[in-house]
């Protein structure tokens, strides 16, 4: 998989066509989801302009977007799954302890003691806050989730490429995977 250039931030993705006029349903990953459409043209992973948002309206699970480029329903549907990037320079300055999800992907995850805990595969939000999907944990198959809160993620260093976590006992462990965990009292 090709990684975006450092000056690009993955901000949205096309979920499919909407209607017959070439509008697309778009999932935004911006902190304020509507902001994804105010940063100018969307770029592909190589920095080439692919779509320019003209109008966006909120709908369940995303936005319906009309683009300046002429699209019909078939062209809009063919774009399903397309990742949309914007220039980092177009985005607002981040506060301390704020991160773009795309900057976190692929970082090494370690415990408080520095022991390797895997790699960050994805950041999800199913409505109750961000969850980190961690994969490659030693002695564990598959991936597991951890809430992205200061309690469980006390330190992130983009510069060092490391996320330090303090998961609850048995989260991310072999015991959790096997359905074990704390015995019932």
Swiss-Prot record:
InterPro entries, per database record: PRC_barrel-like_sf, PRC_RimM, RimM, RimM_N, RimM_N_sf, Transl_B-barrel_sf
Pfam families, A to Z: PRC_RimM, RimM
Keyword Chaperone: yes
Domain notes: The PRC barrel domain binds ribosomal protein uS19.
Self-association state and partner proteins as the record states: Binds ribosomal protein uS19.
Similarity comment: Belongs to the RimM family.
Name listed for the protein in its UniProt record: Ribosome maturation factor RimM
